[in-house]
Amino acid sequence: MTNLRKTHPLLKIINHSFIDLPAPSNISAWWNFGSLLGICLIIQILTGLFLAMHYTSDTLTAFSSVAHICRDVNHGWFLRNLHANGASMFFMCLFLHVGRGIYYGSYLYKETWNIGVILLLTVMATAFVGYVLPWGQMSFWGATVITNLLSAIPYIGTTLAEWIWGGFAVDKATLTRFFAFHFILPFIITALAIVHLLFLHETGSNNPSGINPNSDKIPFHPYYTIKDALGLMLLLLVLLILALFSPDLLGDPDNFSPANPLNTPPHIKPEWYFLFAYAILRSIPNKLGGVLALLASILILLIIPLLHTANQRSMMFRPISQTLFWILTANLITLTWIGGQPVEQPFIIIGQLASMLYFLLILVLMPTAGLFENYMLKPKW
């Protein structure tokens, strides 16, 4: 008798995705982040659902309702800390997942990669609208500054900004719709993640060598289920340490003050995971130029497959490209640091140089390195 998991219409899909899936035998821990992102999404949806049961999306009561969750709801403080720090873990895994894709040439699975970039943008949008909900000072002013960027769009900008606000400034209507967006977007992310997996399973996983692994595959279960379980334990350990011991480490102290439209905080800045893009935005002294650079800093990921010039897929055996990749990583860390600093020298010039280097590395230096490595591989005699 055939096993039920191989014949049942629903179980068959699960079986082909997580049990009998043929996986390359040599994929490293860098391939753990896909499953970790799935776990992060589940944690965020569950904690978010319970928080939404007690939250009120009204300007007069939003801040108080968050305080009420932390003080009066059973384990409400824990749910809130898990949700806030879960977002940080989500982005940490996202950045490592994208970095892995760039390093090992996974972007050559174009459909999977493009859906992944759309996923990244959707998660960023979700995190942004979510940050506004507690209605603290940084929530309010962050929303004001970022939504104001829409007004830089020629001709329709101001109308567009007012349409998003539901009035002439960030107010009650904005908070209500942001709560609605924050509730619906994770389910859209879940649907996109399923499509992402669907396209990935059309081709199968890439592997560190970048060579076609079809001749050497092993079943996903038990080999990679146990490997993913280890990653999950480490993720939960870090998340619990953050949520239980220093829940406010990655937050902004200004958000402990209720939103006040009459008092601007000295340094308006988003959460740490947006700082690299915020630094690129601020490094251009023109509003529209800054907005375009901000968009380009993320959308540039879409053209990475077109910029692949090397004969080898992975960077595993390409030392020059490796060096440039780690310079890019250091550059992004520098941009993250600059995004959190005030707009004054020497931070302005460092931010401008780092922003320039970011685009230069991706658009010019890395494709050139690929061509040079091709030349070096050719026999010279």
From Swiss-Prot:
An example Gene Ontology CC term for this record: respiratory chain complex III
Chain residues that bind a ubiquinone: 201
Cofactor(s) the protein needs: heme b
Membrane association type: Multi-pass membrane protein
Entry binding sites for heme b b562: 83, 182
Cofactor annotation comment: Binds 2 heme b groups non-covalently.
Pfam family, one: Cytochrome_B
Residues the entry annotates as binding heme b b566: 97, 196
Transmembrane annotation, as ranges: 33-53, 77-98, 113-133, 178-198, 226-246, 288-308, 320-340, 347-367
GO biological process: mitochondrial electron transport, ubiquinol to cytochrome c
Further details from the record: Heme 1 (or BL or b562) is low-potential and absorbs at about 562 nm, and heme 2 (or BH or b566) is high-potential and absorbs at about 566 nm.
Family, per entry: Belongs to the cytochrome b family.
Cross-referenced PANTHER family: CYTOCHROME B (PTHR19271:SF16)
Protein role: Component of the ubiquinol-cytochrome c reductase complex (complex III or cytochrome b-c1 complex) that is part of the mitochondrial respiratory chain. The b-c1 complex mediates electron transfer from ubiquinol to cytochrome c. Contributes to the generation of a proton gradient across the mitochondrial membrane that is then used for ATP synthesis.
Protein name stated in the entry: Cytochrome b
